[in-house]
Amino acid sequence: MQEKIRRKSSQPVYLYGMKNMLRIGNKLYTRTSKNKKVYGEDIIRFEHANYREWRPDRSKLAAAILKGLHNMPIGESSSILYLGASTGTTVSHVSDIAPSGRIYAVEVAYEPFSKLLDLAEQRDNIYPILEDANLPERYRFFVDHVDVIYQDISQRNQIAIFKRNMDEFQPRSAFLVLKTRSIASTEDAKTILRKTIEQLSSYNIREVIDLSPYDTDHYLILVDAKGVRR
C-alpha cells in the first residue's frame, strides 16, 4: 500500500537536479511509472508521482549516494552498460533514473538472469544480456553506445574486467564497485584500494566512497575518461 509523505517530517529533496531521484531524511526513492514493487520495497506518492524506495542494504549505488556521492553521470537519457546485473535490483532503479535511456544489463549466471528477464519484460529500457563480462567482444555488437559503465562483479580479476570494458566501449564515465575481499581475502582493504587506484591511473578518479556500514570492505569508485571536461 502506498503512503502519503508527511511534509512536516524530513524535507523532500530532489537529487542531482533530477526529479527522478528523491531523498527524504535517510531514505532514497526513484520515480517510477510502473507502480509495481521489484524486491518488496515501499512505494510512496509525492507530487502526483509514484516513488520506489531505494534501499542501501540492497544496492551499492544507493549506499554510495547516502554516503555522500557528489556526482551522478547517469541522466534521464543515458545509455548504461551494467556489468553484474544479477536479478536486477539496482538495474530497476537505474531504469527509473534513465527512463528514456538504455540499460544493457550483463549477467553470466542463468538463475538470476531469468529474474532479470522478467524485469526486462516490464521495462522497455532494459536490455538483458546473458554473457561473461570478461569477454566484451561477445556482446559488443548488441550495444550501440555507452555513456556510463557500472560494474558490480565479485571476481578476483574485477579490475581487469573493468579496464577491458572501458577500452571496448569508451564511456565518458564509469562506476566500479571494488570488492576487496574478492581480490584478496587476507590483505588489508585499504591496501587493495590503493593498488586499485594505481591501476586506474589512465582515468580521472573523481570520487572514492567507502560503502561501510552497508557493505564492509567495499568501495565505489567513480572515474571519467581522460579528456572529459565537467
UniProtKB/Swiss-Prot annotation:
Single Gene Ontology MF annotation: rRNA methyltransferase activity
InterPro entries: Fibrillarin, Fibrillarin_CS, SAM-dependent_MTases_sf
Family matches, as NCBIfam families: PRK04266.1-2
Coiled coil: none
Subunit structure: Interacts with nop5. Component of box C/D small ribonucleoprotein (sRNP) particles that contain rpl7ae, FlpA and nop5, plus a guide RNA.
SMART domains: Fibrillarin
An example Gene Ontology biological process: box C/D sno(s)RNA 3'-end processing
Annotated source species: Thermoplasma acidophilum (strain ATCC 25905 / DSM 1728 / JCM 9062 / NBRC 15155 / AMRC-C165)
UniProt cross-references to HAMAP family, sorted A to Z: RNA_methyltransf_FlpA (MF_00351)
Binding site for S-adenosyl-L-methionine: 89-90, 107-108, 132-133, 152-155
Disulfide bonds listed in the record: none
EC number(s) recorded for this UniProt protein: 2.1.1.-
Family: Belongs to the methyltransferase superfamily. Fibrillarin family.
Keyword annotations of the record: Methyltransferase, RNA-binding, rRNA processing, Transferase, tRNA processing
Reported function: Involved in pre-rRNA and tRNA processing. Utilizes the methyl donor S-adenosyl-L-methionine to catalyze the site-specific 2'-hydroxyl methylation of ribose moieties in rRNA and tRNA. Site specificity is provided by a guide RNA that base pairs with the substrate. Methylation occurs at a characteristic distance from the sequence involved in base pairing with the guide RNA.
Domain of life: Archaea
Protein name per the record: Fibrillarin-like rRNA/tRNA 2'-O-methyltransferase
Pfam family, one: Fibrillarin
